[in-house]
Amino acid sequence: MYLIRGLKNLSLFNERFSEEQLVVTIGNFDGLHQGHKKIIQEMKNISQNSSAKTMVIFTEPHAKEFFSMDKNIMDQPARISPWRDKFKNLENENIDFAFFLKFNKSLQTMSPEIFIEKVLGPLNISNLMIGDDFRFGQDRKGDFLMLKDWSKSQGISLSKLPTFSIDNRRVSSTWIRETLSLSDFSTTKKLLGRPYSFEGKVVHGNRLGRSIGFPTANIWLPKNNLPIKGVFSVKISIDVSEFEGIANIGIRPTVGGTSPVLEVNIFDFKKEIYGKRIKVEFVKKIRDEKKFDSLDDLKKQIAKDVNTAKEQLLDEKN
C-alpha cells in the first residue's frame, strides 16, 4: 500500500500515478470495523471490474481528539486503534493507496468547497463512495448533495452506502468504544470482524515485575487515551509464535505512575525480546487496576491474577 503523507505530498503522488483512475472513500476509520469494511469491499468490487485502483482518504487524529488536545490524556476521547495499527489494518485490506490528512487547525477551518478543490480535485477519481453519515469541511457543512453536484460536473460516479447493522443496530466506532468500556470483547470482535488487540514495540522498563517474580514485556504506547484499562487475560503473538499471558493497562498507582503503560507477563517465557514488535489480543477482563499498600500485596494479587487468567484462557478454548 502506497502512503501519501498530507496535502504537501499530493503533487508527488500525481507525478507518479496521474494516469491511475481511482475508486475513493473518505473517513477517520478508527478501528476499521465491519461498516468500514463493507465500504472497502464495495470499492474493491468496482476495482476488480475495471482498471481503477482503490484509495482510502483518512484523517488523524479524530476530530474529537483534536478539540480536546488541551486536556489531560486520560480525559481525551478514547481511540480504538493507534495510528500504526490503523495503517496496518488498512494494509491488510489490500488497499492500493492511503491518503493521510492531518486533522489540524488548517483542515478544521477548511470550507467544504476548498476541501473538494484541494483534496479531491487533484485526484483522478472514477468512483467516490461514502457512508450515509459522512460530513466534511468546516463545521461539517459539506454533505452528500454538495458532493453530488461536484461529482456530476466531473463525470464521477458517486455512491452513498446504507448503514451497516448488526443485531438491528448501526455498527459504529461509538458502539465499539462502548463494548470496550464494558470489556465485552466477544461483541467487539463481532463489530470489528477480528479480535481486539494492540501491537507495539517492547521497550525497557524499570524491571519491577522481574524483582517480584513476574517479569513483564513493557510495550510502548502512543500518547492517546486508551479505551480499556485494568488487568486482562491475553494472547500474545511474537514473530510466528503464539503465547498466553496476563496484561495490565494503566498508570501503575502502587509505584507512583502517572502515564498509561501496557505491561505483559508472558507465561512460560524467558527470552529477551527488547525491540521486537508484539501483538497483544485481549480475551477477558480480570479486574480494575488498584493501588496496593505494598509490593508484597501487589505480588500476592498478581499470583491470583495469573491463576484467574489461566482459567479464563482455558475456558475460552472450550
Language-model segments: residues:
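Glycine-rich, Lys/Arg-enriched anion-binding loops that position phosphate/diphosphate groups
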Residues: 151-250
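Positively charged, low-complexity intrinsically disordered leader regions
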Residues: 1-25
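Surface-exposed amphipathic alpha-helices with a cationic face
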Residues: 40-48, 148, 152
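Di-metal (Zn2+ and/or Mg2+/Mn2+) metal-binding site signature of metallo-dependent hydrolases
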Residues: 25-43
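Phosphate/ribose-recognition catalytic cores of enzymes acting on nucleotide-derived substrates
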Residues: 205-318
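N-terminal Rossmann-like or analogous alpha/beta NTP/dinucleotide-binding catalytic cores
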Residues: 65-132, 136-154
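ATP-dependent adenylation/pyrophosphate-handling site
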Residues: 19, 23-26, 43-70
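Residue-level signal for inorganic ion chemistry
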Residues: 33, 90, 128, 188, ...
